[in-house]
Curated annotation (Swiss-Prot):
Homododecamer. The record marks R18 as: Transition state stabilizer. CDD domains: DHQase_II. The keyword DNA-binding does not apply. It comes from Pelobacter propionicus (strain DSM 2379 / NBRC 103807 / OttBd1). The lineage of its organism: Bacteria, Pseudomonadati, Thermodesulfobacteriota, Desulfuromonadia, Desulfuromonadales. Its EC number is 4.2.1.10. It catalyses: 3-dehydroquinate = 3-dehydroshikimate + H2O. Pathway: Metabolic intermediate biosynthesis; chorismate biosynthesis; chorismate from D-erythrose 4-phosphate and phosphoenolpyruvate: step 3/7. Keywords: Amino-acid biosynthesis, Aromatic amino acid biosynthesis, Lyase. This is 3-dehydroquinate dehydratase.
Length: 149
């Protein structure tokens, strides 16, 4: 069974409480449960992780490299726009990386338009709410089933 690591970054533990116009009302726990269910339907093993500490995120990405995860889906939150440490950690991975966001970062404030992760990712999915995670899982499954990295 292919293993997918789903990473959620800074402030994303506040889903369901923070700015429902952009992020909806689902909590991170509800999102993680949906991701696990969607993964099971696709025959994928899902591991979800969230932290508000950049160093912890980098260390989890390093462990993903050591564990040999098959793909990584990341919603880095605000780190998307400035964390070169997270970007450098992602660059170490051999597995495909898919960047995901619940809101359309390109239709929001100017500072959100730039991603330091996008250039390292196979693709970026944004603007579909919780469905962005589902689309990312479908993309990961397609990549892995096609034998692409």
């Amino acid at each position: 069974m292919k293993k997918i690591l789903v990473l959620n970054g800074i402030n994303l533990n506040m889903f369901g409480k923070r700015d429902p116009a952009h992020y909806g009302t689902a909590t991170l726990e509800q999102i993680d449960a949906r991701v696990a269910a969607w993964g099971a339907e696709l025959g994928l093993q899902i591991d979800c992780f969230q932290t508000n500490h950049e160093g912890e995120m980098v260390e989890r990405i390093h462990r993903a490299h050591e564990e040999g995860v098959d793909a990584l889906i990341i919603n880095a939150g605000a780190w998307t726009h400035y964390s070169y440490g997270i970007a450098d950690a992602l660059a170490i991975l051999k597995a495909p990386v898919i960047e995901v966001h619940m809101s359309n970062i390109h239709a929001r404030e100017e500072f959100r338009h730039h991603s330091v992760i996008a250039g390292l990712a196979r693709g970026q999915i944004c603007g579909f709410g919780v469905g962005s995670y589902h689309l990312a899982l479908l993309a990961a499954s397609e990549l892995l089933n096609a034998g692409q990295e």
